[in-house]
Structure formats: C-alpha cells, structure tokens
Swiss-Prot record:
InterPro entries: ATPase_proteolipid_c-like_dom (IPR002379), ATPase_proteolipid_csu (IPR000245), ATPase_proteolipid_su_C_euk (IPR011555), F/V-ATP_Csub_sf (IPR035921). Residues 41-64, 122-139 are cytoplasmic. Its main location: membrane. It is found in: Vacuole membrane. Proton-conducting pore forming subunit of the V0 complex of vacuolar(H+)-ATPase (V-ATPase), a multisubunit enzyme composed of a peripheral complex (V1) that hydrolyzes ATP and a membrane integral complex (V0) that translocates protons. V-ATPase is responsible for acidifying and maintaining the pH of intracellular compartments. The gene is VMA3. The keyword tRNA processing does not apply. It comes from Entamoeba histolytica (strain ATCC 30459 / HM-1:IMSS / ABRM). GO terms for molecular function: proton-transporting ATPase activity, rotational mechanism. GO terms for biological process: asexual reproduction; calcium ion transport. This is V-type proton ATPase 16 kDa proteolipid subunit c. Keywords: Hydrogen ion transport, Ion transport, Membrane, Transmembrane, Transmembrane helix, Transport, Vacuole. The keyword Cell wall biogenesis/degradation does not apply. The record marks 147 as: Essential for proton translocation.
Amino acid sequence: MLMSILLRSVTELCPVYSPFFGSMGITASIVFTVFGGAYGTAKSSVGISSVGVMKPEFIVRSVAPVVFAGIIGLYGLIVCILLFINVTKSEYSLNRAFLDLGAGLTCGLCGLASGMAIGISGDCGVRGAAQQPKLFVGMLICLIFSEALALYGFIVALIMASTGENSCVATASSSSA
C-alpha cells in the first residue's frame, strides 16, 4: 500500500499533497463525532447518577440518552472508513480530497452539535422525568430530534463521499473551461 502511494501520478489535478486533505476529513469525522458522543454520554450520565440516588428504579429507563449519544460515534466511524477507502486509491485528485474533507467536517461537526444537544436535553430530561414521569416521552422526542442532527450530517457526508470525479487526467469538458 505504501508503494502505491509513493508511485501516484503527480499532476496538476492530483498533487502529492491531496491525501493530506482527505486525511483531515477522516480525522475530523471520527474526532468530532466521538467528542460529541463522549460529551452527550458524560453530561447525561451526571443526570442519571443523581436520579439513581433519588429513584433507583428509574435508572434503566434513564439510559436512553447514553444510547443515543453512543450512536453518534458510529456515524463518524462509518464515514471514516468510506473516506479511508477513497484516500488509499492509486489516483487521488484534489477535487476528491476536498470533497472528502468536506464530508468529514460535515459528519463530524453535526455529530458534535448533536452530542451536545443530547447531553444537555438528556441530563435535564432524566432529572425532570424522575420527578414527573409524564416528561419521559417529551425527553425521548427531544433526544430523537437531537439525534436527527447527526443523521443529517451523516447522510450529507455519504453523498459527498460517493459523488465527485477522481480523475487525474484532464477531460475535454474540464480543459475547455
């Protein structure tokens, strides 16, 4: 694999630094989604711990925010794997590299925002549902919509990772512009 990277055709469309931008997309995808998931888990776990002191029987129902926060990291992992497949190809254009960078940032930052929303709403929701059980459904709805933020970024990242040209040879349409 290292030999194929060293033997890449270096042209104006495929400079030697193209993999750097793709690698930054991979890094952004996994790092930001894991940060979001970790924040969501930690923040909502504080609420679960305090609820466990008041009402120990409510702990099992209270783990929903932790599950939702854990799923965010999976989105980043899937995008990370797809982008890695693109970066390790023998021809890797600058166009493809920037698309991969955008895909990684999209998935990662949406995952970070989603994790923060899940953590805050999960913490408050768990505490509120322990005092008033009718709030549990409202908490779940807030968590679902918070998770949807990460899902939107995941879908856009998949579209970006699967589209775009990855050719190091100028075509007739690109050379006439």
